[in-house]
């Protein structure tokens, strides 16, 4: 797991390719990321499935309650099948764009 911080955003990358152990590490350290927007970068793990992404829903919901963004970067996923509560995009650039838009919405009171 690799963690990069840029401004109010933390990017967490899966470097091992083992989603289960990655999810455990992220879940154990979730309180350290509560004050930041989070990007979960799974783009280097082609074996990630929709079922795996759904395991991130509790983390995403908790983060949204704290008025912070939670975006997942994954490739090879049917984006139409992803639950609406989970933001999944195909690239890091789009993840940063989603966070910017959500911050503007929060600033405007939406």
Residue ranges and their predicted role:
Residues 3-6, 11-37, 42-110:
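Amphipathic, Lys/Arg-enriched alpha-helical "gate/interface" segment within cytosolic domains
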